[in-house]
Swiss-Prot record:
GO terms for biological process: cell division; DNA biosynthetic process; DNA recombination; DNA repair; lagging strand elongation. GO terms for molecular function: ATP binding; DNA binding; DNA ligase (ATP) activity; metal ion binding. It comes from Methanoregula boonei (strain DSM 21154 / JCM 14090 / 6A8). Its cofactor is Mg(2+). The active site is at residue 246. CDD domains: Adenylation_DNA_ligase_Arch_LigB, OBF_DNA_ligase_Arch_LigB. The lineage of its organism: Archaea, Methanobacteriati, Methanobacteriota, Stenosarchaea group, Methanomicrobia. Its EC number is 6.5.1.1. This is DNA ligase. DNA ligase that seals nicks in double-stranded DNA during DNA replication, DNA recombination and DNA repair. Belongs to the ATP-dependent DNA ligase family. ATP binds at residues 244, 251, 266, 295, 334, 405, 411.
Length: 550
């Protein structure tokens, strides 16, 4: 497939809003692709280059891309930045610049999809400061051979932000339709290998290839997620339920095979180097080959420390021994996905729990199983008294569903209205805060697109604003006066008094008294609040207000 053909598919998708229409367009494109083209097409159409489980990073930020565009088009850097600021969209700005370029490439060639992929993966393998020139050179050569339309999507892919609204669910359905296989088989394979690109390649071979895929160590699996609910509702729906403490720590996945062991974060990043003490504890706790799911917390004086203490350990890359002395980490394991060559995710939770207690023992999270609401309520109060966030309620007969947020896991914690939102823009601060960003534009998601919801300017200490500035300064993609826009990569937890209907933001809502709570380093922008869930919150809020006034 030529990259120009891929760009035409993207342009068609960009003008669609209906999910079924998107599925149709993608499913038409997939069958004619060669086996080596399928993984590339699928990842690219979702704005990705590497599978979620991969530790590879492209390493091209906005500034490197702007320099590559400058060289490819033969224009001044100021021209590139001005056009991007005017457009507010890197892709369309690059398209305009390439349409008017005066510099001609004498070695022009038609770009092929796999060729572009190979060049980009080559960029990712180059490390160190001296590699920046080589990254710019490769990006410049690709852009130099690109048509204006190709340039629009090539630039966005380099920033891994395609902005055409295609999410995993859409692509899963398109794969099933294109190759006439059961969508449950596509889901099974995705749960096992966590790479829709590879799933598409297997689907082309047929249903047997999909069903033969299994979970393996050192290939992290997306973690099962919980939604909000009530104790009464869970008992009414399921009778007997399992209650566990909800820890204010960081989710982890522990993989062990033989003498080798690694740990992965909620975002599937390998954090083994930062947590050698936790790996050592779990490795000594079991002699089996396992994949475990759990939460690690920081402990001081037998009490859990704040979430930020855990994050500091996850971020640490140097002076690990010193950090181990300062912050003691304790793992709490609550599930097992793999044991000695056997995938366990389809087993009922109570069976997985029995295996877990046999295999690990010491670090298994405490659990209470009951049909009695008062017993579960007491467990909830015990959790709060011990300094934890609340409790998790789980259905004993439920399977483990990687990456899904369903009714089989429910979180119960004190009523605090917060949302996890992506940071997409900011304004510079004033006075003593003029050297950092002072307020932030945050967004929810809707069908794979980020939708502005509110601005957040309170709740930050000076130290936190400096930390956020350091995290975001290299992610700036455009500037207009005091306003900047970011490549979306950071998630804030934002508190608020209430949701209000508002025409100010594209979401149609605004937050009353929004305040910064914390950075969610453990989440990426695909896990933020959806517009649908915000509508649901608003409806529940309205019903509560009506009940109060009666």
């Amino acid at each position: 497939m030529l990259f120009s053909e891929f760009a035409q598919v993207c342009e068609e998708l960009e003008h669609l809003s209906g999910r079924l229409d998107m599925i149709e367009v993608i499913s038409r494109a997939l069958p004619d692709l060669a086996p080596d083209e399928l993984p590339v097409f699928v990842r690219f159409v979702m704005g990705r280059i590497f599978p979620d489980w991969s530790a590879q990073k492209l390493g091209i930020g906005p500034n490197l891309l702007y320099e590559a565009v400058r060289q490819a088009a033969g224009v001044k850097l100021e021209t590139v930045i001005t056009r991007i600021n005017q457009q507010g969209d890197v892709g369309r700005a690059v398209e305009d610049i390439l349409a008017k370029k005066t510099q001609v490439s004498w070695s022009h060639q038609d770009l092929e999809l796999v060729y572009v992929y190979n060049k980009l993966t080559g960029i990712s393998s180059r490390g160190g400061v001296t590699s920046q020139k080589e990254k710019i050179r490769i990006a410049m050569l690709l852009l130099g051979d690109a048509s204006p339309l190709e340039g629009r999507y090539l630039a966005r892919i380099m920033l891994e932000e395609l902005r055409i609204g295609v999410g995993e669910g859409t692509v899963r359905e398109a794969i099933a339709k294109a190759f006439m296989v059961d969508s449950a088989l596509v889901e099974h394979a995705m749960q096992a290998i966590n790479d829709l690109g590879e799933v598409a390649r297997l689907a082309k071979k047929g249903p047997t290839a999909l069903s033969d895929v299994h979970i393996t160590p050192f290939h992290p699996v997306k973690m099962m997620l919980a939604q909000q609910g009530t104790i009464a509702g869970m008992i009414e729906d399921h009778g007997e339920i399992a209650a566990e403490y909800k820890y204010d720590g960081s989710r982890f996945q522990f993989h062990k095979e033989g003498a080798k062991a690694r740990m992965y974060s909620r975002r599937l990043e390998d954090v083994s180097e930062a947590l050698p003490d936790v790996i050592d504890l779990l490795s000594k706790a079991t002699s089996h080959d396992v994949i475990l799911d759990g939460e690690v917390i920081a402990i001081k004086d037998d009490r859990p420390m704040p979430f930020q203490s855990v994050l500091r350990r996850f971020r640490r890359r140097h002076d690990i021994a010193e950090a181990q002395e300062a912050i003691r980490m304790v793992p709490n394991v609550f599930d097992i996905l793999y044991l000695d060559g056997e995938t366990l995710i389809d087993l009922p939770f109570f069976e997985r729990r029995k295996k877990l207690e046999t295999v690990v023992g010491k670090f298994v999270a405490p659990q209470v199983v009951s049909t009695d609401p008062q017993t579960i309520e007491q467990t909830y109060h015990d959790a709060l008294a011990a300094g934890h966030e609340g409790i998790m309620l789980k259905v004993p007969a439920s399977p483990y569903t990687p990456g899904q947020r369903g009714k089989n896991w429910i979180k119960i914690k004190p009523e605090v209205d917060t949302l996890d939102l992506a940071v997409i823009g900011a304004e510079w601060g004033e006075g003593k805060r003029a050297h950092v960003f002072g307020s932030f534009l945050v967004a929810c998601q809707d069908q794979g697109k980020l939708i502005p919801l509110s601005r957040v300017a309170t709740g930050f200490s000076d130290e936190q604003l400096t930390e956020v500035y350091d995290l975001l300064k290299d992610a700036v993609i455009s500037r207009t006066g005091k306003e900047v826009r970011f490549e979306p990569e950071l998630v804030f937890e934002v508190g608020y008094a209430e949701l209000q209907v508002s025409p100010t933001y594209d979401a149609g809502f605004a937050l009353r008294f929004p305040r910064f709570i914390r950075i969610r380093d453990d989440k990426d922008t695909t896990e933020i609040e959806t517009l649908e869930s915000i509508r649901g919150r608003y409806q529940r809020q309205a019903k509560s207000a009506q009940a109060y006034t009666k």
